[in-house]
């Protein structure tokens, strides 16, 4: 379901997310966003989410994966920027910061299992 033959190198959490997303029947395609080359959210910082997902219903989801060691102000700023983008982009667009299961996510973020549950319904 990737848009391209080969995607850029991914870390373990990104790869896990992509494998789970690919298995969902309501996912039309996904794309690995190349930092500093592809899409970014422009705001008080430039934020390059990891993955763009399109559902069969046409919703666009941006997902940023984070390990527990990255619970910091930079991640909080990205959550705020992603939420602002989703509000401005309209009802067909969503943004999620996704932490691996077993980690307590930052406010405004979700775990991998929670994200996949939400994605199944979009």
Residue spans of the language-model regions?
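Electrostatic, structured charged patches in enzyme active sites and in nucleic-acid/phosphate-binding
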Residues: 1-122
């Amino acid at each position: 379901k990737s848009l391209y033959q080969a995607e850029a190198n991914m870390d373990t959490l990104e790869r896990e997310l992509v494998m789970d997303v690919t298995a969902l029947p309501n996912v039309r395609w996904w794309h690995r966003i190349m930092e500093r080359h592809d899409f970014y959210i422009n705001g008080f910082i430039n934020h390059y989410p990891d993955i763009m997902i399109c559902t069969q219903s046409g919703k666009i989801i941006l997902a940023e994966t984070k390990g527990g060691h990255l619970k910091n102000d930079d991640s909080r700023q990205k959550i705020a920027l992603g939420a602002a983008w989703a509000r401005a982009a309209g009802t067909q667009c969503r943004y999620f910061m996704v932490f691996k299961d077993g980690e307590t996510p930052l406010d405004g973020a979700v775990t991998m299992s929670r994200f996949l549950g939400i994605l199944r319904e979009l």
